[in-house]
């Protein structure tokens, strides 16, 4: 599980020795900018080897990332689902807009919090038969790995309600760089994978159980 590279593509080199079947990227691959500034990181991630599924973050610009990521071989999950053998993935990128005037922004992935629950519930029904159900988001749920430096919780209430009601097995997220770690909402494991720009990531192993190993400088 990776997140928050913010175009620092050299950090990807630290991960090249890992033996992984899949890369799940939880948003903010880029740091705003343009297609030209974003292109190196996108293609470097696509060249890592394993398949990559990715949700957009709030600094991944919607006016160019869908086409760029497709060209780089990245599979974007944003309001959509994917079945891979007996593992089901659903994804929702971006973040809730605290100011409603941001909704509909031409370059940013903002949404209203009340949209989160029904959208994810619909996607979750599409993977209902999967042995393991995994959610990828950029923003954490309210009250789980979402605490800012000032102590304020900055997660999504709608996402938390979805996790409480639907109880997927695992949620991977990023966004709040200072809130790396793991917690539980019911039986759902919530993992903020950390800021890859600082060399941080999470190694997930899925078998009969799910194991999570935090890797990088703060492990």
Question: Model regions: which residues?
Answer:
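Binuclear metal-dependent phosphoesterase catalytic core
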Residues: 83-85, 107, 157-166, 179-219
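Active-site neighborhood of phospho(di)ester-bond hydrolases with catalytic His/Asp-centered motifs
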Residues: 1-3, 23-28, 52-58, 76-78, ...
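Core catalytic region of metal-dependent phosphoesterases/phosphodiesterases
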Residues: 7-84
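Short, conserved loop/helix-junction motifs that constitute active-site signature segments
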Residues: 42-49, 128, 163-166, 185
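Conserved catalytic scaffold of divalent metal-dependent phosphoesterases
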Residues: 7, 60-61, 66-154, 158
